[in-house]
Swiss-Prot record:
Membrane topology: Multi-pass membrane protein
Protein family according to the UniProt entry: Belongs to the Casparian strip membrane proteins (CASP) family.
Keywords tagged on the record: Cell membrane, Membrane, Transmembrane, Transmembrane helix
Lineage, uppermost ranks: Eukaryota, Viridiplantae, Streptophyta, Embryophyta, Tracheophyta
Main location as per UniProt: membrane
UniProt protein name: CASP-like protein 1U1
Organism: Oryza sativa subsp. japonica (Rice)
Amino acid sequence: MDGAARAVSLFFRIAVVGLSVAAAVVMATASQAFPFNYGGAVSYTKYPAFVYFVVAAVVSAVCSAAALYLSVVREAAAGWAVALLDVVTMGLLFSAAGAVFAVRRMAPLYLGVAGADTVAGRWVNGEFCHAAGAFCWRVTTSAIICAFAAAAVSVAVLTKGARHRGKH
């Protein structure tokens, strides 16, 4: 089981790096000409939560790559460093995905869409996606990718723990 658990952990660590970079790229390229006169276009840079998302995804990719390196090259000597990097990566990814999902849900209120302050208004207006569909699609896609990255780092940590369980 030790070799299989190590392989699974390494697979998911590699997946975290790729998914974090993909989430950051999808969000960083999200922009659309806005159909109403709210400044001409909407971009991720107009929302502090989306900027946080991009920064958090990039930092989590770096942390995950460092944890991957330490897991492969210096496995025995860097156990505490890998654990710290894993915690930072999980915290950044879960908080970034949560922030994007929250902003996506509350965007009609922020933009002053008519009727958005009522439950019926939010349903009829289709949240933010009603006004800027392509932008919303990219934002939602990047948040989903980020959530998968957070789940992948969780699996990597759990399989690493399963690998060390029998050694004590």
